[in-house]
Amino acid sequence: MYKDLKFPILIVHRDIKADTVAGERVREIAAELERDGFHILPTGSAAEGRIVASTHHGLACILVAAEGAGENQRLLQDVVGLIRVARRRAPQLPIFALGEQITIENAPAEAMADLNELRGLLYLFEDTVPFLARQVARAARSYLDGLLPPFFRALVQHTGDSNYSWHTPGHGGGVAFRKSPVGQAFHQFFGENTLRSDLSVSVPELGSLLDHTGPLAAAEARAARNFGADHTFFVINGTSTANKIVWHSMVARDDLVLVDRNCHKSILHSIIMTGAIPLYLTPSRNELGIIGPIPLEEFSPESIQAKIDANPLTRGRSPRVKLAVVTNSTYDGLCYNANLIKRTLSNSVDVLHFDEAWYAYAAFHEFYDGRYGMDTREQGPLVFTTHSTHKVLAAFSQASMIHVLDSEQRQLDRDRFNEAFMMHISTSPQYGILASLDVASAMMEGPAGRSLIQETFDEA
């Protein structure tokens, strides 16, 4: 699979084009790697190397000159700087230093944390060129083989094996489109991989979205870890459907529900479909028309009881609410203290639903700590968040997720939930959308995700 990705190897060495012994040695290593199927990006400039490492996010490996770096502070900073920019988005990218045995043993302590990120030190003048090239190739292959997240990896593997499509969809991996001029134009525009990977649920090695098995289950579990959830479910028809799944799994006719007046229309559809009785939470609004948050006192037991008493459909009922839904962030971009809402509703509500359609990035930067649904497990309600992954992360249109955080008192009944899930999810899911959810989750994993959010802060 590694050759299919066509990720090049970056070599940064001041003698890469020079008529020196070191230059000749580095060029021989590059030639050996090219014979092994790798493309090489060579540069003799440390500054250019840093630019490539920071902007080319499709590298298989980096080789960087480090001869004399232990005694030369400028050379050492070149190496350290390249390591830092490369690892910002690719924490597992293998980076080798090129030099002699004594290259970095005299480096100062403050540089050692970065130098310890090196995969290894290649001794240019002690080992043979084929041996050195094999060291690099093995590290690059290992990195690329482990790069893809589980479902996307399985989809790429299945498509790359050139399997025939003996099932739906009817275009048969794109073959049908090639049978007419307009279809041929469609095929050329979208490309063969897009069409060959448009598959049916009849491919068992890809798992089942409806049963949450195989690589799809692994992808959902990995996304749950990345977003801080106990359970995550991929949704292929947007957060409007994700919201309806949550409600149909948790709410029954005549249940009391607390509803943010500033909610999406899918919440209103959910009320109609379930037959629940809404009690509305009124958000604030300033003189400019900007919608602010719901005041905290709206969530108090006394306020909830007052809403019940004022509603002719609920008068006389106990103040026990099945589900509360809050739009977080608001449509004007203001976010709630989610943990405070959880605690305030702990004795009043069974299920708390944060509609975070425009807020899927919050889990990946400390700036938002405490202000998103999956942040902290609290006593009281079972917590759902619904994310329009396609709106603010890198995913195809309609790609959404449902995240669930169990509380100490309430855990998700997965079997019951899945009945509602299967009610709303197509039995012919679009695998490109699912793969984009898997990739969106993997992109935000670890320090790479934080760096993406920090970049938006810096640009703002």
Model-predicted regions and their roles:
Residues 44, 99-135:
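Output/docking surface of receiver
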Residues 21-27, 46-49, 58-90, 100-108:
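Conserved phosphotransfer microenvironments
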Residues 2-33, 41-42, 62, 96, ...:
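Conserved acidic segment of CheY-like receiver
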Residues 192-241:
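Conserved N-terminal alpha-helix of the aminotransferase class I/II PLP-enzyme fold
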Residues 47-52, 241-242:
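Short alpha-helical segment
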Residues 43-46, 84, 108, 245-252, ...:
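Conserved PLP-enzyme active-site core in the AAT-like
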Residues 126-213:
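N-terminal "arm"/small-domain region of PLP-dependent enzymes with the aminotransferase-like
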Residues 15-17, 68, 97-105, 127-128, ...:
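Short beta-alpha junction loops
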